[in-house]
Amino acid sequence: MKIFGLIKLDEYKRAHANVRGALDQWQLEVERSHWSGPQDVKSRYPSASILSDNKVIFNIKGNKYRVVVKAKYEKGIVFIEWVGTHAEYSKQNFQ
């Protein structure tokens, strides 16, 4: 999958070195994947949450962090919408 919005991910990695390795691994896995739909995401990431409008919530580093993306499966792209801790995520309203 092609990832758009990497600047959000890169900025977060620079500011939070303790999660950099896990986010690097997630990025590499996503870039090497081709998902045709949410079922492909769930088969690789069973703990991911699939929301309406093709949004996907990924749990990173033992669910301490979250990455929120919007997937365009037919085009093979994902847009990073948000990156943060689980506690910060709980204050957001993703639907």
Give a label for each model feature.
Residues 1-64, 72-79, 87-95:
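Basic, Lys/Arg-enriched alpha-helical interface segments
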